[in-house]
């Protein structure tokens, strides 16, 4: 355990941020998985709906610093390509 007051606070804030980031990443994975399932089923309307929702989640995660902006862009591009293949 840290002895310095600021270190104790950093430990608390880092843990809170870790849990928050973990939650955001989990919801991202779930959104991407549900999109891929719709795309694999060939349901273009549902895939387009989920593409918008997933892109929004990716952008929010990137703006909050949970994932890198380039990673969000690459994932959005791959999802858009998957929709266009249907």
UniProtKB/Swiss-Prot annotation:
InterPro entries: Ribosomal_bS20, Ribosomal_bS20_sf. It comes from the Bacteria. It holds the Pfam family Ribosomal_S20p. The keyword Ion transport does not apply. GO terms for biological process: translation. One of its GO terms (molecular function) is structural constituent of ribosome. GO terms for cellular component: cytosol; small ribosomal subunit. Keywords: Ribonucleoprotein, Ribosomal protein, RNA-binding, rRNA-binding. Belongs to the bacterial ribosomal protein bS20 family. Binds directly to 16S ribosomal RNA. NCBIfam families: S20. PANTHER family: 30S RIBOSOMAL PROTEIN S20, SMALL RIBOSOMAL SUBUNIT PROTEIN BS20C. This is Small ribosomal subunit protein bS20. It comes from Rhodococcus opacus (strain B4). The gene is rpsT.
């Amino acid at each position: 355990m840290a002895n310095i007051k600021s270190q104790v606070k950093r430990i608390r804030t880092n843990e809170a941020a870790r849990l928050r980031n973990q939650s955001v990443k989990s919801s991202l994975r779930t959104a991407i998985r549900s999109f891929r399932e719709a795309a694999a089923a060939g349901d273009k309307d549902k895939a387009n709906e989920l593409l918008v929702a997933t892109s929004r989640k990716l952008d929010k995660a990137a703006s909050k610093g949970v994932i890198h902006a380039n990673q969000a862009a690459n994932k959005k591009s791959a999802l858009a390509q998957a929709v266009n293949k249907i």
